Regions:
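C-terminal helical accessory/scaffold domains
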Residues: 1-63
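Detector for methionine-enriched segments
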Residues: 2-5, 23, 45, 88, ...
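Acidic, glycine-rich low-complexity segments with interspersed aromatic residues
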Residues: 66-178
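Compact mixed alphabeta submodule
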Residues: 171-220
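Short linear sequence elements within intrinsically disordered, low-complexity coil regions
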Residues: 12-16, 22, 29, 37, ...
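Intrinsically disordered, low-complexity N-terminal regions enriched in serine/proline/glycine
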Residues: 6-10, 123, 178-180
Length: 220
């Protein structure tokens, strides 16, 4: 999976190669490219300050993501197997579902500061209440009695939370930000309909850097 994650770092669409081995063979033939990649890897590793931990979900034995690591959405979609070498996930929603190792799961993608489209009435209230509790709103169509609502209430899916400050920001030269993987969450409480308001319990406390913006910037 990590090789496929690298593929989506290098290419913006699926199907550029018939196999990952062919990709590596082609890239290794370009000595200049190989040297540049080695140099870039060293630079990025020296800049990396994320204190990653082992995954805490049911998928920990085969999951390529590290708890509190930072990942692009494309990388996450590879990890949850909604993107393959020949087909890229078309999802642009804030949630994505699949079944991994026979276990139904759902990935929640949260921007604390929303990038609202002009004329949109959508303003989800997603924020950290504490370092281990996260308030999250479903999509506007979800009711408690709906299949989706019931899956949240009954805990029939392994829920994984991914959070970032916002999609892009001036301090990051408007580059798209990655998501911090906060790991497995379980239901604490719920109320309301269309949307439902849910509080999730984090199995592992979120990093202080995430809590700082997730608790204070939600209403910006």
């Amino acid at each position: 999976k990590m090789a496929l994650m690298l593929y989506y770092d290098l290419y913006i669409s699926a199907g550029e190669y018939d196999s990952l081995q062919l990709m590596f063979n082609r890239l290794s033939e370009d000595e200049f490219f190989a040297d540049e990649v080695c140099q870039l890897t060293e630079i990025l590793m020296s800049r990396c300050n994320a204190l990653e931990q082992d995954d805490n979900s049911a998928f920990r034995d085969s999951f390529p993501l590290k708890l509190h690591g930072v990942y692009t959405k494309a990388q996450i979609q590879v990890a949850i197997e909604t993107s393959t070498l020949q087909k890229m996930s078309p999802s642009r929603e804030g949630c994505e579902r699949n079944t991994l190792n026979g276990i139904p799961m759902e990935a929640m993608f949260v921007d604390v500061i929303k990038d609202r489209e002009e004329g949109s009435n959508t303003n989800y209230k997603d924020f950290a209440q504490t370092a281990v509790k996260f308030h999250w709103e479903t999509q506007n169509s979800v009711r408690q009695e709906s299949p989706t609502g019931q899956s949240y209430i009954k805990g029939s899916r392994e829920m994984l939370l991914f959070v970032r400050k916002q999609r892009n920001a001036a301090e990051n030269k408007y580059r798209t930000l990655g998501y911090v993987y906060l790991g497995k969450v379980t239901l604490d409480s719920f109320e309301g309909n269309k949307p439902m308001q849910i509080v999730w319990n984090l199995k592992t406390p979120m990093p202080g850097s995430v809590y700082e913006y997730a608790a204070t910037l939600a209403n910006v």
